[in-house]
Amino acid sequence: MKKFDNLGLDNIKEIFHNLSYDELNAHEKANNEGLSTDNDTFCVDTGIFTGRSPKDKYFVKQDPSSKYIAWGKINQPITKELFDKLLTKAKQELSGKKIYVQDAFCGASLQSRKAVRFVTEIAWQAHFVKNMFIRPSQEELENFKADFIVYNACKCINEDYKQDGLNSEVFVIFNVEENIAVIGGTWYGGEMKKGIFSMMNYWLPLENKLSMHCSANVGEKDDVALFFGLSGTGKTTLSTDPKRRLIGDDEHGWDDEGVFNFEGGCYAKTINLDPEHEPEIYGAIKRNALLENVVLRADKSVDYADASKTENTRVSYPIEHIENHEPSLKAGHPKNIIFLSADAFGILPPVSKLSKEQAMYYFLSGYTAKVAGTERGITEPQATFSACFGEPFMPLHPTVYARLLGEKIEKHEVNVYLVNTGWSGGSYGVGKRMSIKATRACINAILDGSIAKCEFENFEVFNLAIPKALEGVESTLLNPINTWLDKNAYAETRDKLAHMFVQNFKRYEDVKEGIEFSKFGPKI
């Protein structure tokens, strides 16, 4: 117990430190934290919050980090005094109880990884951490020294939030200088995952390494592909490919040696999960995986079509559950980069080839649709712009990440493509969602290099290069104008979306790069 004195907890009844999967499973059952499915996958409810609470996330405003953080609606400041008050409150919540302490690494690169210690009173949250982060070896655990500590006091709420000037009873706070995060009022496991991701997005660029919200895989010829996109755009699904080894499904770094996963697991959406379309993910849901907010039938089988709790049903599992994963969790420099957008307006083509400058423009734009349930208050797709395809997790100015990406694209001669996994034939409510089959055909053509041999035409207003024909995709789909019955509505919607891009990009024109790249966007 003595080695845990620095946690600042009083009268701890018992500490369960780095439990095995079997031990965690036994604790989950003994604590009545959820149910087991028909194939012995444990299944939990995350309570009121079935997605992240972005309006309740704060960074402590203090030097030296305050001069690097891009303060605003996303990176909200909080005082050191208020942080101390809420940390004390969280520690009081965790004191006098049985607690779970789970140690893990974030980052598969030895030169870039961080050692993180998670403290919680809920067994399934320790299980989630064990699934999602990199599991240290026995020797590494014996010599483990935490770079960062996360106190997850999910049962603790801040009743004084109004007088404290905060958004709600929920709080997710990061103290960069003290290397501590504290979570209160939400049980959603994704807060821990994305919280440490946010910290990696602070640390790495300051070391001239790029941190990315993307998935990554590697082919038989060691050709690496990166897939950028917000939650629900298909990153996990499209990067899970039987012909390619999965490096990771969500968070990566890119340094002088190549690409490396931050995580040791995957966090996949399960709504309408179909074993035919997504056999790898379906097969990964077995003992040691952890299902969130799904509905069980009477026979304990999972009804993946049931969204009565949330559209954002999820499963976390160790990456070893994907048969075809890259065991080292890292690879060389990318050959192809794919930006995924779920276009709710049905305007963007299924696939477009981007120049380096256009790549910077669309990376900074980060256009997609927020898909139902990945955040509180979103019940249907809503068009949005999220810098770097992950603005909620980027503490620094977006152009810091864009500059690093541009340098790496140029240095390693990377091909960049924009792929629309959203709507075709009309906007949301009129058109239909692009089929996974068509999207897969576009991705395959990029990865096998056959798209480079296509004849391209210009997609007007957006000035994107789109293929005239592509194997496995109906030719009418390739140019969106052909899929809309009402051509006037199409032109009107196209111009409306182009205008939104232009308006959004004005926020970057306070810096040199922003002005430079603005000319590579749509021309109204």
From Swiss-Prot:
Its EC number is 4.1.1.49. One of its GO terms (cellular component) is cytosol. CDD domains: PEPCK_ATP. Binds 1 Mn(2+) ion per subunit. The keyword DNA repair does not apply. Pfam families: PEPCK_ATP. One of its GO terms (biological process) is gluconeogenesis. ATP binds at K194, H213, G229, L230, S231, G232, T233, G234, K235, T236, T237, E278, R314, T439. Its cofactor is Mn(2+). Coiled coil: none annotated. It is an enzyme of class 4 (lyase). GO terms for molecular function: ATP binding; metal ion binding; phosphoenolpyruvate carboxykinase (ATP) activity. It catalyses: oxaloacetate + ATP = phosphoenolpyruvate + ADP + CO2. Involved in the gluconeogenesis. Catalyzes the conversion of oxaloacetate (OAA) to phosphoenolpyruvate (PEP) through direct phosphoryl transfer between the nucleoside triphosphate and OAA. PANTHER family: PHOSPHOENOLPYRUVATE CARBOXYKINASE (ATP), PHOSPHOENOLPYRUVATE CARBOXYKINASE ATP. This is Phosphoenolpyruvate carboxykinase (ATP). The gene is pckA.
